[in-house]
C-alpha cells in the first residue's frame, strides 16, 4: 500500500495526531496515478538527484526515492520530521532537511549528495502561498538545476507559461521564461487532496535554457522594465513608462527616443510585447540615459 492511498494517509495522520496548519499551506495528495505521472513527466531515473520541497508525509517522496539516485527533501514543519522518518524508513537514499528552502544554503547542501555531480531536478508540490518566491529563488540561484516539475495553483502555472497577447501574460511569464522553457503538462483536480484546496492545480514542467532567451545589457533593469509595463495592465506602455520614470519634458524626450530605437509604438500595452521586445526596450532606455 502506498503512502498516498487515502486509507494509509488517514492512518498515518491519526497515528501521529497530526493536524493541518493553514500557515504552511498543507494539502496532501492522495492519488497514486497522479504521483506516477509526476515522476514520468520529470523523467526521473538513477542518473538524477532530486530536490523536493514540502514533502508532507512522503507521498511523492516515496515515488521519487524509488526512481532517483537520491532525494533531498526540505520540510519547514518540524512536526512532520518524525512522520517522515517513519514513512520513509525503508529508503537509504532520502535526506530530510528540516529547513525553510528560502533560507537554505543550497550550494552547501547539495554537496551532501553521495554524487553531487549528477544532474539535479526540482520536483515538488509547492505551497500556494509562497510558490512564486520559491520558484524565483531557485531559478535565480547559481545552481544549474536541469529542470523543475512542480505542482502549483493552475492560475499561476498559466501565468508562468503564458505567451504575449494573452490575459495571463505578465512580468512573471517573462521572469521565468527568460531562464526556462515552461509548459503545463496536466491539470490536477482539487478533489484528490486532503484537505481539498479551493482551486485546481497544474503540473508545470520548466527546463533550463542553455543560456537566457535574450541577451541584455543589465538584467536587473530588464526585469524592472518588464514589471513597469504591467503595473496598470489596461494602460498603454507610454502611460506606465511615464508614471514610473517621470513626466518631465527631458524624460519624455528620452522615452520617445528609446521607443523609437526599439521600434515599439508607445500606444501599445505591455501584454503585446515579447521578451525580445522588452530586451530591446530595456537596452534602448539604457542607451538614452534613463
From Swiss-Prot:
A GO term, aspect molecular function: RNA binding
Domain of life: Bacteria
Signal peptide feature range: none
Listed InterPro entries: KsgA/Erm (IPR001737), rRNA_Ade_diMease-like_C (IPR023165), rRNA_Ade_Mease_Trfase_CS (IPR020596), rRNA_Ade_methylase_Trfase_N (IPR020598), rRNA_adenine_dimethylase (IPR011530), SAM-dependent_MTases_sf (IPR029063)
Catalytic activity line of the entry: adenosine(1518)/adenosine(1519) in 16S rRNA + 4 S-adenosyl-L-methionine = N(6)-dimethyladenosine(1518)/N(6)-dimethyladenosine(1519) in 16S rRNA + 4 S-adenosyl-L-homocysteine + 4 H(+)
Listed GO CC annotations: cytosol
Keywords for this protein: Cytoplasm, Methyltransferase, RNA-binding, rRNA processing, S-adenosyl-L-methionine, Transferase
Matching HAMAP family: 16SrRNA_methyltr_A
Record protein name field: Ribosomal RNA small subunit methyltransferase A
Gene symbol of the encoding locus: rsmA
Amino acid at each position: 500500500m502506498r503512502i498516498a492511498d487515502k486509507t494509509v494517509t488517514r492512518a498515518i495522520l491519526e497515528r501521529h495526531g497530526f493536524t493541518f496548519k493553514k500557515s504552511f499551506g498543507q494539502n496532501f495528495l492522495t492519488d497514486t496515478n497522479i504521483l506516477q505521472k509526476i515522476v514520468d513527466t520529470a523523467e526521473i531515473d538513477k542518473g538524477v538527484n532530486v530536490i523536493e520541497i514540502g514533502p508532507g508525509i512522503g507521498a511523492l517522496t516515496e515515488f521519487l526515492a524509488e526512481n532517483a539516485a537520491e532525494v533531498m527533501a526540505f520540510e519547514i514543519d518540524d512536526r512532520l520530521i518524525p512522520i517522515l522518518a517513519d514513512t520513509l524508513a525503508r529508503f537509504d537514499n532520502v535526506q530530510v532537511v528540516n529547513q525553510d528552502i528560502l533560507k537554505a544554503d543550497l550550494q552547501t547542501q547539495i554537496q551532501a549528495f553521495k554524487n553531487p555531480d549528477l544532474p539535479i531536478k526540482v520536483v515538488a508540490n509547492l505551497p500556494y502561498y509562497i510558490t512564486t518566491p520559491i520558484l524565483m529563488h531557485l531559478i535565480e540561484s547559481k545552481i544549474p538545476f536541469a529542470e523543475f516539475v512542480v505542482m502549483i495553483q493552475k492560475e499561476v502555472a498559466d501565468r508562468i507559461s503564458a505567451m504575449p497577447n494573452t490575459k495571463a501574460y505578465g512580468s512573471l511569464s517573462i521572469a521565468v521564461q527568460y531562464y526556462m522553457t515552461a509548459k503545463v503538462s496536466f491539470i490536477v483536480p482539487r478533489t484528490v487532496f486532503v484537505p481539498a484546496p479551493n482551486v485546481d492545480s497544474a503540473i508545470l514542467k520548466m527546463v533550463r535554457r542553455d543560456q537566457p532567451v535574450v541577451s541584455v545589457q543589465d538584467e536587473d533593469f530588464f526585469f524592472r522594465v518588464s514589471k513597469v509595463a504591467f503595473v496598470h495592465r489596461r494602460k498603454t506602455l507610454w502611460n506606465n513608462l511615464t508614471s514610473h520614470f517621470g513626466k518631465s519634458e527631458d524624460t519624455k524626450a528620452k522615452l520617445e527616443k528609446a521607443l523609437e530605437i526599439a521600434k515599439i509604438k508607445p500606444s501599445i500595452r505591455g501584454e503585446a510585447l515579447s521578451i525580445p521586445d522588452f530586451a530591446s526596450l530595456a537596452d534602448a532606455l539604457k542607451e538614452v540615459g534613463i
